[in-house]
């Protein structure tokens, strides 16, 4: 169900004021990532997740967005599940530019109770030299990933940090460049994040990859608190000659020379992985 955004600027100011006074009494809970880092020219959705326990219907959900000190009235879509008492509000920005950078805030008002969240939007230009010099490090920054049609594919970005971040502070988003429009498109299915003390691994799983649709240039964007970094993965299809049999079996003739090869790489958690 979709809720309408109907709130005036003075009402928005009042809601924010009441949030500071009654924050400890509120039933409404709003969550959002503190920092969102996106490639320039892409289409994005800034999202706030809503939770309530008052049994409110969709008509009781009032939402407002601010960019800096100004109210935003376009591109807002709010959904609400009356049964589960959860929902989300999204602010859609098309072809995001550097001018869109800055502070955003969503405010949610339900049956007299309110909550809000602020987030910062960062926009970067993608180039061969794209790299943020901060305490989030993605290794390797660039690498090639081989795939075979029909075989499950997992693309990974291992990252490390100089300090410990909570689960709510760490996010990973995956993007793939469109070969025709040259526009970065966000990948939302198959995204997973595994954390350890000082970093983790973000992955993108494609259960049934195909040459053309799944091959190409991917980008992982990892944010920790108010900083982030990017890594690039080039997915290429193995040729029939370099591909192996589906059952991973090999045959040889008696008396002939035979050599078998395996790939060994270091695990980010210590030790070694044999593929």
Curated annotation (Swiss-Prot):
One of its GO terms (cellular component) is B cell receptor complex. Keywords: Immunoglobulin domain, Repeat. PROSITE patterns: IG_LIKE. The keyword Repeat applies. Residues 25-122, 140-239 form the Ig-like V-type domain. GO terms for biological process: B cell receptor signaling pathway. SUPFAM superfamilies: Immunoglobulin. It holds the Pfam family ig. PANTHER family: B-CELL ANTIGEN RECEPTOR COMPLEX-ASSOCIATED PROTEIN. This is Putative Ig-like V-type domain-containing protein FPV055.
């Amino acid at each position: 169900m979709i809720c309408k955004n109907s709130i005036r600027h003075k009402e928005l100011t009042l809601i924010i004021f009441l949030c500071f006074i009654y924050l400890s009494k509120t039933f409404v809970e709003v969550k959002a990532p503190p920092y969102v880092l996106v490639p320039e020219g892409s289409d994005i959705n800034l999202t706030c997740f809503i939770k309530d326990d008052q049994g409110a219907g969709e008509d009781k959900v009032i939402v407002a967005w601010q960019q800096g000190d100004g109210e935003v009235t376009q591109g807002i879509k709010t959904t609400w599940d009356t049964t589960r008492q959860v929902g989300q509000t999204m602010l859609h920005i098309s072809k995001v530019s550097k001018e869109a950078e800055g502070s955003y805030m969503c405010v949610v008002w339900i049956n007299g109770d309110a909550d809000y969240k602020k987030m910062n939007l960062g926009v970067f230009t993608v180039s061969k030299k794209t790299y943020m010099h901060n305490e989030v490090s993605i290794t390797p920054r660039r690498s090639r990933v081989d795939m075979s049609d029909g075989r499950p594919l997992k693309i990974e970005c291992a990252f490390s940090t100089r300090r410990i971040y909570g689960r709510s502070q760490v996010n990973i988003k995956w993007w793939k460049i469109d070969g025709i429009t040259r526009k970065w498109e966000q990948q939302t299915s198959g995204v997973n994040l595994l954390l350890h003390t000082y970093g983790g691994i973000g992955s993108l799983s494609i259960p049934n990859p195909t040459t053309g649709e799944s091959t190409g240039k991917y980008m992982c964007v990892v944010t920790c608190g108010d900083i982030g970094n990017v890594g690039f993965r080039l997915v290429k299809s193995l040729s029939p000659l370099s591909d192996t049999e589906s059952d991973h079996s090999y045959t040889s003739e008696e008396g002939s020379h035979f050599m078998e090869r395996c790939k060994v790489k270091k695990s980010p958690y210590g030790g070694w992985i044999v593929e």
